[in-house]
Amino acid sequence: DGFTVPSRADGMGVVAQSGSRVTLVRNHEQREVGVPIGDPDKAYGNVDGGTTTLVFDTAAGELLESRVSLGGTLHNCAGGVTPWGTWLSCEEGVFSPSLRHLPPVGKYRYWNIERAEREHGFVFEVPAEGVAKPEPIVAMGQFEHEAVAFDAGTGIAYMTEDNAPDAGFYRFIPRTPGRLRDGGRLQMMRVVGRPDMTDGLRLGEQHDVEWVDIPDPARGFAPGTRRPSGVAEQGLAAGASRFVSLEGCAFADGHLWFTSKSGGRQQSGYVMEYDPVGEKLWMVFESQGRRHFSGPDNIVMSPRGGLVICEDRLSGDKSGQSVAGLTPQGEFFRFCQVNPELGGEYAGHDLAATAVGSEWAGATFSRDGEWLFLNVYSPGFTVAITGPWAEGYL
């Protein structure tokens, strides 16, 4: 479309496939006030996060199209594909112009967003074709959103929150399935007998789950502050459970999986599995430490039954980060790694210095399960991987 391709490629999903033409929507986790990506007349605000839409030909192994499909949003981290073929792009940054007089807290002290013109911290819906009409889905909450996964049978959307020390795991029950802007109920998970889910978990130990209502989903800040924990604090006050730094979220075969990047005994991350029918929750993987695979982030379920896990490493190890797999039996294995010998330049970046330390993100499969698409977050590019896959769980 003539616009520069943004950097910081993060969450991504396949929203359509017709024959060999696969359409993907890709997030860009940018957070600078200035000129929005794409057409400024179609942007939500004056920050530079958003999405691009890619069309890839699997028969030819070639990229056919690349265009901006959402602009003017803040720190678009992950999201999720809806059952009706759109992409939900989630803002991980929370901001309100009405609170500009209060001092920023935490990471926001270092972000260049003080001149942002709009409210941020919401979910936006992006169509497979054209450019999104940038309307926040306020009923889904104003918080540090990460990922979304749908139970297509019920229409319920499940969401993770990437905040610390207080993060929630949420579900949104839409008033009208398929029409999220019609509103609905936002609820936060309560693990019975476990108000703190950040540590002390055992592999395979099942926990009963309940849900508490969030009275005011649009209250993104703790009262009188710019601390972006207003929604989580409402849930905690009603008895919900506290998680930390929740990341990826995936739904398949009636169950849901989600990750915590820094939870667990080693504060290096874990993966949970949830049964919404039985209302049970249990841990299926826990990182053994920051010298091992750590910081589990974006996830997707392979059509062959294995969970694909992107690494956002928590240590200073300079070897390339990995994409891993988890079998239904709980066996963990590494699938691929950023090549530490990677060289050359891309968009002004020395890849040997930039890409090697980058996280993986955006894992998603083509509808036929033959192609796996992944992003290398920095400097921001997408790879397409094909099989043969038949001999393994991925």
Label each residue range with its predicted role.
Residues 1-394:
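Sequence/structural signature of beta-propeller domains
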